[in-house]
Amino acid sequence: MYKRQKEYSTIINKNELDKWKRKITEKGYVAIDTETDSLNAIQANLIGFSLATGINEACYIPIKHDNADKQIHIDDAIHFLKSINEDPSILKIFHNKKYDALVLDKYNIKVNSYDDTMLISYSLGSGGTRHSLDFLAKKYMSHSAISFKEIAGSGKSQKSFNEISINEASIYAAEDADITFRLWKILRPRLMGEKISSVYETIERPLAKVIMDMEKNGVCVDEKILKELSIKFENNIKRIEKECFVIVGNEFNLGSPKQIGEILFDKLKIKGGKKTPSGAWSTDAETLNFLASVSYTHLRANETRHD
């Protein structure tokens, strides 16, 4: 259960920033969340960042807020971030590290030694849940995190993060770092307990770096081969659909989780199904993979999935 017992700090002078650096070095870990002016990491400018070294131990460091009387100088902020992120003895904890690392890379900051709570969540249940920070805070802590709309508004009048007051930004950003740290404490031990560490350590985490480099540098593709593969995959899906229709006895939408659930568990009476909170049959990847050895129809249905 999430409970904030004290107010978060806003760091606006270098002495306080230095104190946080010493604290982080002593503990050997820190949750970090960057705040920017764009969802596109390649285009984003760093407006500030938040840190957490424990539950309720979080702060926000403003850098480039408009009309702010006092905030940390960009040079001091970059020096701090570089020294922390490039120190392999300090574990950095992110939620969607790929985004933060792309932002930091623009300032020649590389990230060494890190965990990513979004990837940990994905490793624990790739098809069974969403993996946003807000969703996981609600799921594991019964906490409704402050939304961006609450501090920035929405629609055409929505403010960019640099236009938001430091006071409002501080509460929002520091909470994100605090939640990230709490999630890490909850989810990291489960990797070992559920024997999924190797999936995270050898597949998901390394792959994120590859995808980051692809987003940053682009990739070369053979357009002709790509088109041939697209046609091949499309034909395979159509063939599998026809097989399923023959087995079931009627056509249905293989892209509809609701219809697949009804076919598998209501019509074919396959055992082992589970329902979502809304009362519909669950047909996430975890459920379908579990049932693969039971139902040929299910196995073929799963092969048409694009996620």
Where are these regions (language model features)?
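Conserved "right-hand" nucleotidyltransferase catalytic core of DNA-directed polymerases
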Residues: 3-65, 85, 112, 128, ...
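Amphipathic coiled-coil/heptad-repeat helices and related helical stalk/stem segments
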Residues: 13-17, 73-78, 97
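Acidic beta-strand-to-loop metal/phosphate-binding motif
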Residues: 31, 90-97
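Nucleic-acid-processing active sites and adjacent nucleic-acid-binding tracks
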Residues: 54-92
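Short active-site loop/helix that positions an aromatic residue
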Residues: 98-107, 122-124, 264-265
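Alpha-helical scaffold elements adjacent to nucleotide-binding pockets in ATP/GTP-utilizing enzyme cores
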Residues: 100-103, 132-136
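Conserved beta-strand -> loop -> alpha-helix junction used to position metal-binding or nucleic-acid-contacting
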Residues: 110-125
